[in-house]
């Protein structure tokens, strides 16, 4: 078909956010995947389905879209051992638990100088019963840009989850969630190293935040405080674009449902990722 109209049928990576479709380890300077792209939006979120995709381009820009109807989620979203709303727990994959399609669409525009901005939306039904139909939706905005002759790269994503939760459920199962992350990577050395002609040494920084329950207590009206904050500086060595050795220091604060003083943790992480 035309570049604007291409058909895809089979197992589809739902185009919600950017990380879900671009999750390969060698693309990143960080050992862990972002929390918002793994604990809000399910990691490597794919389902059986079909849809259209396409793009058009001008001199300095590219405009693309994707639109799919797929399977979606089941009621494990609000019936799981985590005792909170968790979309990754309710991925249906090749099965359609609700009997209804989940629709996902994305529109992205890329400028040669300014970078790429994407907006995506998912909506579906996760309950199996017609009489008690429960809906779920995800809205996401993502950005990716390279500057200073590709020596500075900025990547980020924000996701907002909303869903119907029966009134009989306890308040740990929130109706709204939000998460975001920003990665900043700068190349400080780019020259031949130990026989690798295009080796790079990069400094990196990730800031991320996830709020698993943005609701308020019905008794007091006070906000529910189940959230995680993290800052992750790192350094990496790339002998080529397809291989990365990385060292991260992850500092994280996690606040519980009741808003008690946050628990703090810190870890040094080592990683190697490559295409073989």
Task: Name what the model sees in each region.
Residues 67, 84, 220-221:
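Short intrinsically disordered coil segments
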Residues 28-29, 40, 114-276:
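Outer-membrane beta-barrel pore domains
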Residues 75-129:
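Loop-centered beta-sheet repeat module
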Residues 32-33, 87-88, 227:
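General secondary-structure edge motif
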Residues 22-24, 35-42, 79-82, 96, ...:
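Extracellular/periplasm-exposed beta-strand and loop segments of Gram-negative cell-envelope proteins
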Residues 1-75, 99-103, 108-116, 181-194, ...:
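Outer membrane beta-barrel
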């Amino acid at each position: 078909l035309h570049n604007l109209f291409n058909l895809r049928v089979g197992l589809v990576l739902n185009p919600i956010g950017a990380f879900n479709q671009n999750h390969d380890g060698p693309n990143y300077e960080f050992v862990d995947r972002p929390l918002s792209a793994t604990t809000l939006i399910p990691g490597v979120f794919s389902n059986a389905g079909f849809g259209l995709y396409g793009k058009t381009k001008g001199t300095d820009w590219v405009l693309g879209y994707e639109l799919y109807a797929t399977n979606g989620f089941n009621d494990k979203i609000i019936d799981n051992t985590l005792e909170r709303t968790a979309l990754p727990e309710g991925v249906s994959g090749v099965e359609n638990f609700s009997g209804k399609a989940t629709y996902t669409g994305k529109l992205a525009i890329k400028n040669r100088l300014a970078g790429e901005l994407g907006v995506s939306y998912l909506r579906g039904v996760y309950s199996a019963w017609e009489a008690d139909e429960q809906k779920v939706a995800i809205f996401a905005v993502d950005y990716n840009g390279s500057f200073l002759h590709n020596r500075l790269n900025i990547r980020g994503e924000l996701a907002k989850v909303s869903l119907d939760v029966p009134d009989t459920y306890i308040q740990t199962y929130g109706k709204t969630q939000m998460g975001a992350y920003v990665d900043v990577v700068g190349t400080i050395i780019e020259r031949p190293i130990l026989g690798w002609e295009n080796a790079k040494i990069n400094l990196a920084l990730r800031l991320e935040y996830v709020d698993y329950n943005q609701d308020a207590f019905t008794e007091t009206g006070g906000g529910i405080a189940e959230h995680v904050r993290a800052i992750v500086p790192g350094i990496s060595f790339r002998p080529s674009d397809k291989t990365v050795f990385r060292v991260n220091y992850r500092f994280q604060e996690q606040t519980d449902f009741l808003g008690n003083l946050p628990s703090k943790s810190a870890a040094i992480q080592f990683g190697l990722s490559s295409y073989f």
